[in-house]
């Protein structure tokens, strides 16, 4: 058993969470559980952890699954005609995606994305009801973790609003795209910019199906590209 925690390497709290986790484990009498840092800044070395292509692809697919779920669930649930129908549909597809990611049917990623968007797009909702849309922004863990933000999405929906959450993948795209600014304005290496742009292409390739299906849907908007957001 081990805990893997990402570290950004910057000055925000995301760099320091790993230290708090280790301290919490020690205080709980579970100091034997290792906490592995996942970072691209060389903060810690983890010789026992190897990022294989299969692991990286699975991680990217998991992120896209989560982003698509947030996009379709938060869009449809506030307007559902049958209470609980959106959550039931989410629970069904969640298990399908878990089975896919854990290797039971890894090649079904494209088919699953198509099915998720199709089924949520057909979910019965009140088409005449309009609610204020409230965007959620902020520090990355607090933004995406319900337990860290006191279940903000649930609160907004109870108060009669529709929550809008940006994609987690966009954070990685921003980090990769930022290497261009560092090269052009801060004197960083060109190699970093090249690698960043290659990462953008790889990430966009993974969510290509999601973007295409969202564009064809009636109720959802596709993700904006990082180049457009940067402008």
Question: What is the role of each PLM region?
Answer:
Residues 1-231:
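An N-terminal assembly and electron-transfer interface module characteristic of large anaerobic redox
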């Amino acid at each position: 058993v081990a805990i893997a925690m990402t570290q950004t390497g910057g000055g925000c709290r995301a760099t320091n969470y790993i230290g708090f986790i280790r301290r919490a484990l020690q205080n709980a009498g579970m100091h034997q559980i290792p906490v592995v840092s996942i970072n691209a800044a060389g903060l810690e070395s983890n010789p026992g952890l190897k990022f294989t292509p299969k692991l990286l692809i699975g991680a990217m697919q998991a992120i896209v699954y989560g982003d698509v779920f947030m996009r379709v669930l938060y869009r449809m649930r506030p307007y559902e005609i049958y209470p609980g129908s959106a959550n039931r549909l989410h629970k069904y597809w969640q298990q399908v995606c878990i089975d896919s990611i854990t290797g039971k049917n890894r090649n079904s990623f494209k088919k699953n994305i198509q099915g998720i968007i199709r089924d949520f797009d057909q979910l019965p909702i009140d088409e005449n009801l309009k609610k204020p849309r409230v965007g959620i922004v902020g520090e990355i863990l607090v933004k995406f973790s319900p337990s860290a933000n006191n279940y903000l999405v649930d609160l907004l929906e109870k108060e009669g609003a529709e929550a809008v959450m940006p994609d987690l993948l966009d954070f990685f795209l921003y980090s990769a795209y930022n290497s261009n600014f560092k090269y052009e304005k801060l004197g960083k290496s060109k190699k970093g910019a090249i690698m960043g742009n290659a990462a953008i292409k790889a990430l966009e390739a993974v969510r290509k199906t999601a973007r295409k299906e969202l564009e064809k849907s009636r109720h959802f908007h596709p993700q904006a590209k990082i180049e457009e957001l940067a402008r």
